[in-house]
């Protein structure tokens, strides 16, 4: 009955808001069991939570017409939560504590909760749509809760090797209890209802005391306070002539800001003989000797530079750090990242940090290293996410200490492991009260010191193809849950899913005329692009992207695109300087002007043909990901190509790439299908010790 009611009322809607305004007028009272009556009927299990719902005014809502998901914590969970939060607050008031940690809870007694805290806790556990566990895929629950927050999902196994699902780190103990107006899932812990910003969330965790102190003293906590742009008023608009078929696409539903902090726990600092902020600053002066300003809040201070390198303006969940096992489905669109990659294809992302330097995040799927970590646990490199991973240190042999790799005169750590949050949550001895998700960002714990050094990065980490998906260049696509979109950001469609990017929505994009329609199309299994998604620009397009900063040096800048009869003639600019002659995007790679020849039609596996194409300024697509059109490696796909835009010296300054349609007879139907960029050090291109297949990845 519930599903029939829901479909009957919602079937005509082509899009819905993920946080709906719930009409409480003319409520229909069900004769059967509702979510609210079910909870009340089982008060011996949910009585404390029922009290909170009543105080917040939500119990009557859960007894009335609608469609809801309720994650219901047990009485034990509520009692434990109140005691823990009260203890955290009281401990922060003791002598020697750096500052008060305000949890909103100042008593372990349920009756002492304020109305506002009851409201926050209650709304955290209720979603305005009904979802069974079979509806939940990926890394977030498919709708925001009534607090306008996404809840994270993770999976594991219990002591009997049975599958277990976690919501915001809380284990589902009983699930999929369907009622007339929704579904109830029982959770073993209260879901973190924190409205803390990222710095405040870090401050609440005692095992991050040194990092939190450094974050505060440098003033960098002030750069991570934004959450939502309340001046953004275009959520309900649609842009005409925006998709590949000249159809309309919606504007983004919101403009959220987001951040990620990679944090060393105190135990990591202690292992490196760092016990307080003075010790850390002394070491920072060794790692950043040119940062000589003694003022901690100066960008020219060594401590400031150390902390800034840990911070991103992208809100990255653990399962979105790299494109691995990413799934999504909305309407008629489905996506599984593993359908798009070779099993041993490394997964890498590159982001500019608040230091203005690049951080590499990688899961080395091609590695066969298996070794015990510091606790004796056997770990596989191929299933581990690293920061600043280097192939060089294990190219010819396994490092002597695979989980503590250090190089150079300063012994800079590489292959810094990002700890799996499921493991961190389970280790309550070392990480009590770990809470990964803040209001506006994510906290990741790392197992070693994270240090930036130009020479080390250029020589060990970024000495290869730096491939960056266009969607990763624009933080707002990640922060608003549009990149790798899975139907949870606010719209539901029956076919393709995409969003128009209005001018001024992101500081990382410039649009130079009103006819330009720059849009993002979310991944689907039928797309041939890297990571399954793409950006398009329709009409008389003229737009630019901000490039991430790389270590100073000479690089080959490449751009990947899919050609076609309606793809225009493009003039490229880098930093407002014309680069070469206009490029005809209307031809495919097997056109003689590009010169593609399939590897299996040559006598040397395509080596000579690669050189011929490169002399014309082109490369075949990489072999490390798949194009469904050819049923195999994208290298075989003749509709796509990589273009060498320019070879130039990139300084520490900010650089832009501009893409302009100069097709004089375009009637507005041309569009530019762009996929990723590559920045490749010229020094790496000259190396002869790199295997051919590695260079083709």
Predicted regions, residues:
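Sec-dependent bacterial lipoprotein signal peptides
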Residues: 1-18
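Mature, structured domains of secreted/extracytosolic soluble proteins
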Residues: 18-697
């Amino acid at each position: 009955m519930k599903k029939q009611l829901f479909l009957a009322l919602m079937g005509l809607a082509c899009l819905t808001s993920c946080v709906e305004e719930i009409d409480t007028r003319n409520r229909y009272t069900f004769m059967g069991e509702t979510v609210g009556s079910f909870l009340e009927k089982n008060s011996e299990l949910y009585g404390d939570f029922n009290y909170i719902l009543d105080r917040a005014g939500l119990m009557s809502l859960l007894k009335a017409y609608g469609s809801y998901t309720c994650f219901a914590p047990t009485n034990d969970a509520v009692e434990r939560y109140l005691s823990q939060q009260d203890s955290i607050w009281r401990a922060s008031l003791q002598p020697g504590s750096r500052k008060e940690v305000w949890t909103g809870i100042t008593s372990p007694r349920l009756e002492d909760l304020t109305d506002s805290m009851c409201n926050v806790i209650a709304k955290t556990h209720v979603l305005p749509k009904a979802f069974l566990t079979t509806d939940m895929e990926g890394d977030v629950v498919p709708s925001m809760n009534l607090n306008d927050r996404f809840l994270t999902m993770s999976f594991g196994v219990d002591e009997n090797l049975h599958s277990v699902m976690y919501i915001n780190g809380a284990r589902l103990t009983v699930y999929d209890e369907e009622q007339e107006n929704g579904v109830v899932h029982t959770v073993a812990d209260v879901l973190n209802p924190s409205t803390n910003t990222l710095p405040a969330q870090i401050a609440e965790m005692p095992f991050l005391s040194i990092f939190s102190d450094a974050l505060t003293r440098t003033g960098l906590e002030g750069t991570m306070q934004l959450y939502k742009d309340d001046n953004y008023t275009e959520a309900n608009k649609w842009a005409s002539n925006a998709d590949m078929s000249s159809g309309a696409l919606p504007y983004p539903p919101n403009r959220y800001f987001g951040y990620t902090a990679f944090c060393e726990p105190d135990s990591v600092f202690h292992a490196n003989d760092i016990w307080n902020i003075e010790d850390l600053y002394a070491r920072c002066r060794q790692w950043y000797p040119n940062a000589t300003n003694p003022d901690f809040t100066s960008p020219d201070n060594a401590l400031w530079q150390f902390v800034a390198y840990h911070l991103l303006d992208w809100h990255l969940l653990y399962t979105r750090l790299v494109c691995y096992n990413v799934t999504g489905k909305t309407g008629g669109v489905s996506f599984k990242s593993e359908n798009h990659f070779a099993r041993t294809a490394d997964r890498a992302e590159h982001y500019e940090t608040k230091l203005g330097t690049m951080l590499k995040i990688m899961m080395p799927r091609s590695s066969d290293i298996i070794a015990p970590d510091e606790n004796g646990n056997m770990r596989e490199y191929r299933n581990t996410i690293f920061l600043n991973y280097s192939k060089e240190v294990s190219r010819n042999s396994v490092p002597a200490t695979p989980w503590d790799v250090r190089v150079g005169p300063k012994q800079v750590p590489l292959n810094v492991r990002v700890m799996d949050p499921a493991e961190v949550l389970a280790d309550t001895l070392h990480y009590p009260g770990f809470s990964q998700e803040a209001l506006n960002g994510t906290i990741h714990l790392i197992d070693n010191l994270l240090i930036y050094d130009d020479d080390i990065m250029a020589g060990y980490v970024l000495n290869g193809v730096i491939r960056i998906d266009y969607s990763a260049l624009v933080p707002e696509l990640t922060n608003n849950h549009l990149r790798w979109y899975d139907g949870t950001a606010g719209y539901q469609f029956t076919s393709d899913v995409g969003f128009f990017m209005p001018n001024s929505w992101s500081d990382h994009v410039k649009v130079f005329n009103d006819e330009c329609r720059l849009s993002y199309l979310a991944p689907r299994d039928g797309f041939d692009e890297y990571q399954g998604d793409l950006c398009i620009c329709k009409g008389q397009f003229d737009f630019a992207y901000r490039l991430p900063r790389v270590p100073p040096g000479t690089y080959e800048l490449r751009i990947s695109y899919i050609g076609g009869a309606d793809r225009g003639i493009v003039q490229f600019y880098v930093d407002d300087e014309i680069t070469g002659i206009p490029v005809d995007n209307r031809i495919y790679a097997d056109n003689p002007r590009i010169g593609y020849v399939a590897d299996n039609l040559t006598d040397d596996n395509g080596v000579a043909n690669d050189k011929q194409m490169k002399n014309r300024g082109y490369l075949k697509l990489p072999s490390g990901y798949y194009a469904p059109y050819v049923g195999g490696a994208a290298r075989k796909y003749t509709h796509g190509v990589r273009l060498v835009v320019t070879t130039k010296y990139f300084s520490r300054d900010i650089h832009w790439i501009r893409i302009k349609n100069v097709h004089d007879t375009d009637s507005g139907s041309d569009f530019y299908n762009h996929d990723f960029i590559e920045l490749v050090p010229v020094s790496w291109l000259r190396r002869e010790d790199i295997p051919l297949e590695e260079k083709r990845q």
